Amino acid sequence: MPRQRSPLFVLFLTVFIDLIGFGIVIPILPLYAEHFHASPIAIGWLTGIYSGMQIIFTPILGKLSDRFGRRPVLFVSIVGTAIGFALMGLAHGLPLLFAARILAGITGGNIAIPQAYIADVTAPEKRSRAMGLIGAAFGLGFTFGPLIGGLMSRISYSAPFYFSAGLAVINAVLVYLILPESLSREQRARPHERASMVEVFRHGRGAMFAIVLGTYFFLIVGFSIMTTLFALFTERRFGYDAQANGYMFGFVGIVSVIVQGGLIGRLIKMFGEVALARTGMILTTISLALLPMSNSLAFLLLVSAGLAAGSGFASPPLSGLASQMVEANWQGRALGILQSAGSTARLLGPLLGGWLLTFDMQKPIAQYGYTPFLAGAFLCLIGAIFAFCFKKPAKDRSTEDIAVGV
């Protein structure tokens, strides 16, 4: 298959549409669950169970894509996502809503497949910039998705879920008709190979892969604490309502798109993946520590931009480095393990952040949010320390010298 830009463009559209559907659900799901008399604890589990399923099934889907090809596994998983969204819209109680979230979490583990596809069709020195396209799709999806969801909720609580199901159907058709397969039969892993973490480490640079994994995990734990509590923080500190918080999340999404979709290639060319990952971890740590000190809109916007830029600087290089730590036909499994670490972090971060916030509930407004956000900053600092233990792969040396934006 010729290595050209069109598959990456189709892949970008695939992830973008997928993330719009996911983003639509974000502002609606808690209110939808309350409609069924869900307690706060039940809502927490309803949110976390999605990531819990991703923890289990992301590496499995990565293995299946290594064995059977990226395109068919991506197609089937997107169809499953459409069914999950439709079931959410049809739900008349919590049992079916939980079942739908479980299905959505299982099929939502497919994010490793686009990353593995990129690893298949790009040279190592251009890989992190291409990974930035995935980050840009995330940013756009999280920018427009919640806004669309908020607007559609005026029709009914179930309308956004039906709309998301329709988007997933369009996405499945797009993958089936347009996206070419990136793996030849010779490149696909043999049936007897297993996707255990130990074997992935054995088929690459195990120690460095573990360090990349740890860095990514702490980044996502800290960042997910922020995303979970941001609306509660701004509501109490500034009196922001859902619409105002939607604008704030939109701003964060725009910054993410600019960084991961436009700047990442040039920055990797100038500084290299390792240096950029370290810079992103430090910037995220500082921004999280400054967030509870926000006392004006200008300061809040500045800190929010720092958080978006920091995670945008760190995440694509970490994905690119992880793919370079293993042999070619193990990249899907390696990236699947990386995304499972992210899913674990997205499960633990909200639970940890919510628990830590209880210590601030009786404090003055000026002190509200310090405990969870400073804890998140500390966790990101641990990740930054991990990042300073990186040793570049020999083949990665060119990332500082070769133009990756071309």
Regions found by a protein language model. Name each.
Residues 1-5, 180-214, 237, 405-406:
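Juxtamembrane intracellular "pre-TM" segments in multi-pass secondary transporters
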Residues 174-178, 374-406:
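Multi-pass alpha-helical transporter architecture, strongest
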Residues 153-166, 355-379:
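A membrane-interface helix-boundary motif in multi-pass transporters
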Residues 58-69, 259-273, 357:
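Helix-to-loop junctions at the C-terminal end of transmembrane segments
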Residues 55-94:
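Conserved MFS/SLC helix-loop-helix module at the cytosolic interface between two early adjacent transmembrane helices
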Residues 100-139:
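Cytoplasmic helix-loop-helix junction between adjacent transmembrane helices
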Residues 27-41, 228-244:
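Short amphipathic helix-loop junctions that connect adjacent transmembrane helices
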Residues 274-318:
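C-terminal transmembrane helical hairpin of 12-TM major facilitator-type secondary transporters
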